[in-house]
Structures are given as structure tokens and as C-alpha cells.
Amino acid sequence: MAWPDLDPPRLAERPLSLQEALFVLEAPPEALPALAEAAIRVKEYFFGRRLKLVRLLNVKSGFCPEDCAYCAQSARSQAAIARYPLLSLEEILERAEEAQRLSARRFCLVAALRGPTPKVLERLGEAAQAIKARFPLELCASLGLLEEGMAEALKAAGFDYYNHNLNTAPSLYPRIATTHTYQDRLWTLKRAREAGLKLCSGVILGMGEGPKEVYEMALALRELGVESLPVNFLLPIPGTPLGDGRTVAGLTPERALKALILFRLLNPKAELRASAGRERYLGPYEPLAFRMVNSIFLQGYLTQPGSPWERDRALWESLGLDVEEGACG
């Protein structure tokens, strides 16, 4: 087929069709530079050359009753990770100060839970109020499934975003988790939206999806209107059901980059984040990825290490990207 129309305003008005998306995902190697430049143009049209730095904090590690196949903290996991109860208020504030020193613009508080308990809501509510009083950080919570009133409590405490990833396509979800459904995740995002929280929701690629499922994920997130969209690439962790790496065998740097391009083109106004696994899978294309996304995670993920801060800084400085600063509104 002919090249699709990749004009940024047009992409904001009308999503790519499945046929156009497959053109991107199945493009030959010689088309990759032009597709990458198109994605970069989209990012710069809507956001300029800004890059937002995001820091994660795992406020409670392990002991999660859910059975997500990718997760080292789940009930099915035998992974050798640190497991600890809910951090104290003082520990959370120390890590917020560290995030500020690293030039982070957003601080994400994550807990391995089916959903937040009253204790978790109280502790993180206190933490949010204290952080907002001291640091110009955007705050995001990722605490599992939300019941009635929980999102409102988080919003009142000062959280700006709620993270709850769709992770994969609806048709594949029963392979990934059985203790909750894809629809449960959609309900949680709906509750967060109705409470006035901005939505952070993304995917984990490399869990057995094909090109059509990648399109399905990207389109679903567009239809949800998520403000923040992390694209993760599976890090197989020994001791988890997906720990043998069989599902990522074909995830080459070219395929990883083309997937990121598609998420950019289908979600031109979303804050796209190159998340877990970028260091491993993007390889020589990581500089291109930095130019087409809005944000990156700093210094690692929930249970896995990431890039040293100095390495990432050298990369964004070499590309002339402007790191976001300033008080959050």
C-alpha cells in the first residue's frame, strides 16, 4: 500500500486504520528511518523537544495476591526479589527528595496489591500532602483495582495521575492473569477519570502478541484518552511464568522501535514513555526513541535495574532535549 498520511494534525483527528498500522509494524528495514522521523515530527509538533523524567518508588514489594504472569511480585512468582511491607512516611519523603535531586518531574508511588487498603490510602495520602508541600513534583499512584471512593481520596490528597496499565490486548488477557479481568482494569480507569485524576495506562510488549494485537492495544489507549502512556518491553524474570523468555524471542530492536512508532502515531497527544526494557530491546535505536517519546523512567523499575542516571543524561544532552522543570499545576 501507499504510505499513510502521517501529518500530525490529521493523526490527532483520525486514527490510523488497521491496514495503515500493519504498514508501520511490518515495514521493511529501509522504511524505518522515515517512519522514525515521522514519529519524531509528531512528538515535536505537539510537545516540542521536551523530555520529562519520572521516578518510581515501590512502596510495598511482593506478597501480591494477583497472578499476573509477568510480575515478580505476584502470587505465582518464585522470583528472588526484595519483599517488604509498606514503607514509612519518612522513607517515602526521603525518596521524594532523591527524585527531586535527580531532576524528576513526576514521582510514582506503586504498591503490589489487588487494591489499596485503608492503611495504604492513609499513608500515601499523608505522603502526597507532605510531598506537595515540599517539592514541585507531579504525583502518580499505582495501587491496583479501585473501589468506590478510593480515587476521590487520592485526588483529595494531592495525586495528579492514576496508573493502571491495560498491559495487553483483551483477547490475550486470560493468558496473562486470571484473578481479575481486562474489564476490571477498564472500570478502575473509569473511576479514576470520574474522580478528576489524569490517566496513566500502557502496555507490556513481548507477551505473545502479534501485530494486530499491538494495534488493538494502541487504539484502545487512544479511545480511553489517556494522558500518560508507558510502553514497556517484557523483562523475563526467572521464577515467573514468563521467566524463560520464550515470548520475547522475536522482539528485535527493529520491532521494538516500530511498536513505539505506532504508539506515537496513534496517540499523538499522549505523553508517551519509553519504559521498562528500553535499555535491553531498543539497542542502537534508543536515541531515536528518546526523540519520539515525552518521558523516561530514571534509574530502574519496580524490581529490576535500569540505566544509570549519568548514561541517560549524556544521551538526552547529546540529542539536545530540554528536561522539564518547574512547579506542577
Swiss-Prot record:
InterPro entries: Aldolase_TIM (IPR013785), BATS_dom (IPR010722), Biotin_synth/BioAB (IPR002684), Biotin_synthase (IPR024177), Elp3/MiaA/NifB-like_rSAM (IPR006638), rSAM (IPR007197). Keywords: 2Fe-2S, 4Fe-4S, Biotin biosynthesis, Iron, Iron-sulfur, Metal-binding, S-adenosyl-L-methionine, Transferase. GO terms for biological process: biotin biosynthetic process. One of its GO terms (molecular function) is 2 iron, 2 sulfur cluster binding. It holds the Pfam family Radical_SAM. SUPFAM superfamilies: Radical SAM enzymes. [2Fe-2S] cluster binds at C108, C140, C200, R273. Its EC number is 2.8.1.6. Its cofactor is [4Fe-4S] cluster; [2Fe-2S] cluster. It is an enzyme of class 2 (transferase). PROSITE patterns: RADICAL_SAM (PS51918). Residues 46-275 form the Radical SAM core domain. It catalyses: (4R,5S)-dethiobiotin + (sulfur carrier)-SH + 2 reduced [2Fe-2S]-[ferredoxin] + 2 S-adenosyl-L-methionine = (sulfur carrier)-H + biotin + 2 5'-deoxyadenosine + 2 L-methionine + 2 oxidized [2Fe-2S]-[ferredoxin]. Pathway: Cofactor biosynthesis; biotin biosynthesis; biotin from 7,8-diaminononanoate: step 2/2. The keyword Disulfide bond does not apply. Binds 1 [4Fe-4S] cluster. The cluster is coordinated with 3 cysteines and an exchangeable S-adenosyl-L-methionine. Belongs to the radical SAM superfamily. Biotin synthase family. Catalyzes the conversion of dethiobiotin (DTB) to biotin by the insertion of a sulfur atom into dethiobiotin via a radical-based mechanism. Homodimer. This is Biotin synthase.
